[in-house]
Regions:
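Interfacial loop-to-helix junctions that mark the boundaries of transmembrane helices
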Residues: 1-3
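Transmembrane helix-loop-helix hairpins at the membrane interface
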Residues: 5-119
């Protein structure tokens, strides 16, 4: 029961707390302001790079060995995901963060399962 309770708690955090908070901040606040200021192409790339940089900073705060592959994965995957979910929100979600939240929560769950197995 202890492991299942932990998995449930971690899953809820991945789905709601982390994904929702990051989507509200990065896509609901940062992306909207950068896109309004510099246009969709530049604003979306800028917010995606900031999103990727945050995830790289989180890696640097761990004791995981810092290989080039890890640096690239932890920077590039969130950067691409950040660009895609902002595009999804703006082009298909009428500006709502809900589509991005769903995509982000799914990515967090996949990562939550895959990273311990592959890292």
């Amino acid at each position: 029961a202890g492991v299942l309770a932990w998995l449930y708690t971690a899953g809820i955090q991945a789905l709601i707390t982390t994904a929702l908070a990051e989507e509200i901040f990065f896509r609901g606040f940062v992306a909207k302001r950068l896109i309004a200021w510099r246009g969709f192409a530049v604003g979306n790339i800028a917010q995606a790079l900031l999103f990727g940089a945050l995830h790289l900073a989180l890696l640097l705060g761990t004791n995981a060995p810092l290989t080039l592959a890890r640096w690239l994965l932890v920077l590039l995957i969130p950067t691409v995901q950040g660009w895609v979910v902002a595009w999804l929100n703006e082009r298909h979600g009428n500006g709502s963060v809900a589509p991005g939240w769903a995509a982000h929560a799914t990515a967090n769950l996949v990562t939550f399962i895959a990273v311990p197995l592959l890292w």
